[in-house]
Swiss-Prot record:
GO molecular function, one term: heme binding
Main localization, broad class: mitochondrion
Transit peptide: 1-24
Database matches in InterPro entries: CYP11_CYP27_families, Cyt_P450, Cyt_P450_CS, Cyt_P450_E_grp-I, Cyt_P450_sf
Membrane topology term: Peripheral membrane protein
Heme in keyword set: yes
Pfam family, one: p450
Entry-linked PANTHER family: CYTOCHROME P450, CYTOCHROME P450 11B2, MITOCHONDRIAL
EC number assigned by the record: 1.14.15.4, 1.14.15.5
GO cellular component, one term: mitochondrial inner membrane
Record's protein name: Cytochrome P450 11B1, mitochondrial
Swiss-Prot/TrEMBL keywords: Heme, Iron, Membrane, Metal-binding, Mitochondrion, Mitochondrion inner membrane, Monooxygenase, Oxidoreductase, Steroidogenesis, Transit peptide
């Protein structure tokens, strides 16, 4: 992407629109202007097929978030971007998110990932809601929401997550206390990944895997590697037309299919076990989302499998990386860490009595997670394929156009978030703060918001709650971490963390 990021700017002069952004729900009183045609919109310089070649040559686009951010600085708050056979519009101001929300149809459309679709078509698998548009998407989504996204569902699976989070903290504490100094310096990332798999598997399938022990299940470790391979190959294939990449990237397609094969096998084994237990009439108790869906019996088994696999694949990296970046920010902002610790200690008795209270008793910790996702959004864009003509930044956007909101730039806009480079969770709680005027968009909006958002939120909330009340978290690293785009935004490297037990 550096090829076009360094290209000559098409529009001369500094761009000041970033510093005049308005929060959602406000309107400027400027006189109306004549709407400009779509063709007049600034276009990202460079050849669309050269971009495909660049992605193929670099085996991805790791700096996409930075390149797009720079393009906004050069071209203004809206621009056209073409890559290969795809045409899209990028925006980054709150007012444009609001317009997209207002234009939301009954069946919000978004671009479907060609590599993921290609695998399912080749293997004869049904698609889950992540890979559907139209009436079938809406029907399936409305049937999934009660057992995955609703507040009653959250109340059912929160105690399961709490048990895993407590085990994580106790296991870590045992390791720390083996050291005479009462502290331990380590790479915590593998443990956090195991936690997210352990918690998500329990919530989905009602099954503990034993990943928090010293000798974790090899199948689950292979599952982590399969996810990494799937995400990496997705980026390398998603922008290149399949008719071209089948010749230029045949080994990458093979790696992509093999990764999905393992993910499907992993999930299918768990679903089959639950199905057999229910068929045998085992005594019922809440044992996860899949069992609830099977007992509800308003979706076919194949549909349940398709959506469970989407949730399984999307429940690990997308939760682990925000947890790791939150630990990093708290380690280099000890005053914020202490405020969060005090909140957790005050609320501990009530949360211990009823883990569901964590979602209401820890407002500052919830704000810290919002702040992490503002700076490091796992998904760098939100997108909609608009169903009707609309106007964004005074340009006509024809129906059918794919519009992408770059969350990375939106979260770092000083007109929306004061001192955007600083880690300041309190901004989300201040009555006059930017966070109180602007919604938290990391999980999307409307009917197409992330189906697993409540699972992810409670997994992050409870792990941090139990870690903070038991440990001081420190790091020698104070410099910003380089983030890379590999289908999701992730740190290129992570520093070592020191955990000091609190007696």
């Amino acid at each position: 992407m550096a090829l076009w990021a360094k290209a000559r700017v098409w529009m001369a002069g500094p761009w000041l629109s970033l510093h005049r952004a308005r929060p959602l729900g406000t309107r400027a009183s400027a006189a109306p202007k004549a709407v400009l045609p779509f063709e007049a919109m600034p276009r990202c310089p460079g050849n669309k097929w050269m971009r495909v070649l660049q992605i193929w040559k670099e085996q991805g686009s790791e700096n996409m978030h930075l390149d797009m951010h720079q393009t906004f600085q050069e071209l203004g708050p809206i621009f056209r971007y073409d890559v290969g056979g795809r045409h899209m519009v990028f925006v980054m101001l709150p007012e444009d998110v609001e317009r997209l929300q207002q234009a939301e149809s009954l069946h919000p459309q978004r671009m479907l990932l060609e590599p993921w679709l290609a695998y399912r078509q080749a293997r004869g698998h049904k698609c889950g809601v992540f890979l559907l548009n139209g009436p079938q998407w809406r029907l399936d989504r409305l049937r999934l929401n009660p057992d995955v996204l609703s507040l009653p569902a959250l109340q059912k699976y929160t105690p399961l997550v709490d048990g895993v989070a407590r085990d994580f903290s106790q296991t870590l504490k045992a390791r720390v206390l083996q050291n005479a100094r009462g502290s331990l310096t380590l790479d915590i990332a593998p443990s956090v990944f195991r936690y997210t798999i352990e918690a998500s598997t329990l919530v989905l399938y009602g099954e503990r895997l034993g990943l928090l022990t010293q000798q974790p299940n090899p199948d689950s470790l292979n599952f982590i590697h399969a996810l990494e391979a799937m995400f990496k190959s997705t980026v390398q294939l998603m922008f290149v037309p399949r008719r071209l990449s089948r010749w230029t990237s045949s080994s990458m397609w093979r790696e992509h299919f093999e990764a999905w094969d393992y993910i499907f096998q992993y999930a299918n084994r768990a679903i089959q076990r639950i199905y057999q237990e229910l068929a045998l009439g085992h005594p019922w108790h809440y044992s996860g989302i899949v069992a609830e869906l099977l007992m509800r019996a308003d979706m076919t088994l194949d549909t349940i499998k398709a959506n469970t696999i989407d949730l399984t694949a999307g429940s690990v990296d997308t939760t682990a990386f925000p947890l790791l970046m939150t630990l990093f920010e708290l380690a280099r902002n000890p005053e914020v860490q202490q405020a969060l610790r005090q909140e957790s200690l005050v609320a501990e008795a009530r949360i211990s009595e009823n883990p569901q209270r964590a979602t209401t008793e820890l407002p500052l910790l919830r704000a810290a997670l919002k702040e992490t996702l503002r700076l490091y959004p796992v998904g760098i864009t939100l997108e909609r394929q608009v169903s009707s003509d609309l106007v964004l930044q005074n340009y006509h956007i024809p129906a059918g156009t794919l519009v992408k909101v770059l969350l990375y730039s939106l979260g770092r806009n000083p007109a929306v978030f004061a001192r955007p480079e600083s880690y300041h969770p309190q901004r989300w709680l201040d009555r006059q703060g930017s966070g109180s005027r602007f919604p938290h968009l990391a999980f999307g909006f409307g009917m197409r918001q992330c189906l697993g958002r409540r699972v992810a939120e409670v997994e992050m909330l409870l792990l941090l709650h139990h870690v903070l009340k038991n440990f001081l978290v420190e790091t020698l690293a104070q410099e910003d971490i380089k983030m890379v785009y590999r289908f999701i935004l992730m740190p290129s490297t992570l520093p070592l963390f020191t955990f000091r037990a609190i007696q």
